[in-house]
């Protein structure tokens, strides 16, 4: 691995941009906001934060980012999607809105708002493969889950208890990572460290 800190962009259209930047810096990366296609040339990896996935897709199209994002990710740019960002990295949606567009890249089917609306948001812990030090603190806000994955996708984490036990909430495919939850809101930077290591990899 290189000793030079990687530069990781955070797509700054919606979501917890500042919190992701702070977590990336704590995890040993340089971080910058990404709003224009030309800014993609200056980064080694990209975080797609939470927000509202249909709005995020529309904004990405309006800002001329949708096609460049697809091309860069297809060409191997490491990316990490949280919540709505997970939806954006999905190849398929179980319940997509009419005309909803994603970036794709992970061979998975995702269900939006699977855990319920805002009132059903919750915090819990997730045992996550590839993350040392015990369970990860996880904040779920109108969160999706993964309905199914293709053979190249590694399931990293599932809900461990309750009536949603067994639901997939963290996956990896190659240099793409996605979680249903928001680690940037917890102060626990281990998932961001995992992604930084993937980018360095």
Swiss-Prot record:
This is Pyridoxal 5'-phosphate synthase subunit PdxT. NCBIfam families: PLP_synth_Pdx2. Pathway: Cofactor biosynthesis; pyridoxal 5'-phosphate biosynthesis. Pfam families: SNO. PROSITE patterns: PDXT_SNO_1, PDXT_SNO_2. The active site is at residues 83, 182, 184. Catalyzes the hydrolysis of glutamine to glutamate and ammonia as part of the biosynthesis of pyridoxal 5'-phosphate. The resulting ammonia molecule is channeled to the active site of PdxS. L-glutamine binds at residues 51-53, 112, 141-142. It comes from the Bacteria. Keywords: Glutamine amidotransferase, Hydrolase, Lyase, Pyridoxal phosphate. GO terms for biological process: glutamine catabolic process; pyridoxal phosphate biosynthetic process; pyridoxine metabolic process. In the presence of PdxS, forms a dodecamer of heterodimers. Only shows activity in the heterodimer. InterPro entries: Class_I_gatase-like, PdxT/SNO, PdxT/SNO_CS. It catalyses: aldehydo-D-ribose 5-phosphate + D-glyceraldehyde 3-phosphate + L-glutamine = pyridoxal 5'-phosphate + L-glutamate + phosphate + 3 H2O + H(+); L-glutamine + H2O = L-glutamate + NH4(+). GO terms for molecular function: glutaminase activity; pyridoxal 5'-phosphate synthase (glutamine hydrolysing) activity. Its EC number is 4.3.3.6, 3.5.1.2. The gene is pdxT. Belongs to the glutaminase PdxT/SNO family. CDD domains: GATase1_PB. GO terms for cellular component: cytosol; glutaminase complex.
């Amino acid at each position: 691995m290189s000793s030079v800190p990687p530069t990781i962009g955070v797509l700054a259209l919606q979501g917890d941009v500042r919190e992701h930047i702070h977590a990336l810096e704590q995890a040993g990366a340089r971080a910058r906001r990404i709003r224009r296609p030309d800014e993609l040339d200056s980064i080694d990896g990209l975080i797609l934060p939470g927000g509202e996935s249909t709005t995020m897709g529309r904004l990405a199209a309006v800002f001329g980012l949708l096609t460049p994002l697809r091309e860069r990710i297809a060409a191997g740019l490491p990316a990490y999607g949280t919540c709505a960002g997970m939806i954006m990295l999905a190849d398929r949606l179980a319940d997509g809105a009419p005309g909803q567009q994603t970036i794709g890249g992970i061979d998975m089917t995702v269900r939006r708002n699977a855990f319920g609306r805002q009132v059903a948001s919750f915090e819990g812990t997730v045992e996550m493969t590839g993350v040392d030090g015990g369970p990860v603190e996880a904040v779920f806000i109108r969160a999706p889950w993964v309905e199914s994955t293709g053979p190249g996708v590694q399931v990293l984490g599932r809900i461990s208890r309750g009536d949603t036990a067994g639901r997939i909430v963290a996956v990896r495919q190659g240099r793409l990572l996605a979680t249903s939850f928001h680690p940037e809101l917890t102060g626990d930077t281990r998932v961001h460290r995992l992604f930084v290591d993937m980018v360095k990899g």
